């Protein structure tokens, strides 16, 4: 199943100039609809919103009350400026032109909550059907009391904890193959034995090039390791798939999960448009092998798998997602 929330989030509407192609989901859908085997079966694999919503109580299972309150009060615009890193230290704007905005940052927060609901629904569909790919989700840089890297709240942990509260899930895995370390997910679940995390990521790039201590001397949380941590050094593309296989094998030592979220970032792609992904340059063949290995690993163990788009920037970001879904849906 493929889950699509029409509209999505177009950052340019808010004056934000981060290079996320607003039409990457549309391009994926076009590629699937144009496939001679997949297109005629659209009614069997394409899903829309089921009305799920993310409420304050869902966020409070994961995030600090004072942080959640900022999103629902007068501090929402300041929150969005911080999380999307739109203001430099000297007060000037960074990748942000408020004069070009057609919608307010408060509206972006409302869109974000709607976007998060898709991650929860994706998990529900995976529990029902065995597989679901959400054309959205994957905000793995959301931390307990702050967000960075364009991630306001952590939709992955929020969805898992809601499923746990509802009794549909006891244990879960998160397999994160985005180019950037899933630092928020690792930090939020570090003391939670019910959630096992794997992250394979650039070993020296953002957020791992940020300071390891705050001005007050306390450690910063982005260095907290995932349960299975796989840093790839610059130039390590040739060992990527082998190290992924080794990491997946380690998961078998942990309790069998009721649900697996896969954070399927396309930003390791050699044609990605975000400068901070330059240390990991995989071609389409390697990215397809990555996704096939994860999907087959989970299929062999009959584990429900909920896939999230996560990172992927520039005009070609849709290509890795489309090729995997063509394979998964039995395309020509």
Name each model-derived stretch.
Residues 1-332:
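HDAC/HDAC-like amidohydrolase catalytic core signature
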């Amino acid at each position: 199943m493929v889950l699509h929330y029409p509209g999505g989030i177009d950052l340019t509407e808010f004056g934000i100039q981060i290079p996320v192609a607003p039409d990457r989901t549309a391009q994926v859908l076009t590629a699937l609809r144009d496939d001679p085997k997949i297109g005629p079966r659209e009614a069997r694999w394409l899903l829309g919103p089921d009305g799920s919503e993310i409420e304050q109580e869902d966020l409070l299972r994961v995030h600090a009350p004072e942080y959640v309150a900022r999103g629902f009060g007068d501090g929402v615009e300041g929150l969005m400026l911080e999380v999307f890193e739109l203001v430099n230290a000297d007060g000037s704007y960074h990748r942000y032109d408020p004069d070009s905005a057609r919608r307010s940052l408060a509206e972006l927060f409302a869109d974000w909550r709607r976007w998060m609901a898709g991650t929860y629904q994706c998990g529900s569909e995976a529990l029902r059907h065995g597989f679901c790919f959400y054309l959205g989700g994957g905000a793995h840089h959301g931390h307990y009391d702050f967000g960075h890297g364009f991630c306001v709240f952590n939709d992955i942990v929020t969805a898992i904890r809601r499923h746990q509260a509802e009794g549909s899930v006891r244990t879960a895995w998160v397999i994160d193959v985005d180019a950037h370390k899933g630092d928020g997910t690792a930090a939020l679940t570090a003391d939670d034995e019910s959630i096992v995390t794997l992250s394979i990521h650039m070993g020296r790039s953002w957020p791992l090039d940020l300071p390891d201590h705050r001005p007050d001397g306390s450690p910063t949380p982005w260095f907290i390791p995932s349960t299975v941590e796989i840093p790839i050094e610059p130039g390590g593309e040739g060992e990527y798939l082998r190290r992924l296989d080794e990491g997946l094998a380690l998961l078998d030592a942990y309790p069998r999960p009721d649900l697996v979220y896969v954070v399927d970032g396309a930003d390791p792609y050699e044609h990605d448009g975000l400068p901070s992904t330059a240390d990991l340059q995989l071609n389409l063949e390697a990215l397809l092998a990555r996704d096939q290995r994860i999907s087959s690993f989970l299929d062999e163990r009959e584990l429900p798998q909920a896939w999230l788009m996560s990172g992927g920037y520039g005009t070609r970001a849709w290509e890795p997602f489309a090729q995997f879904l063509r394979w998964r849906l039995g395309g020509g």
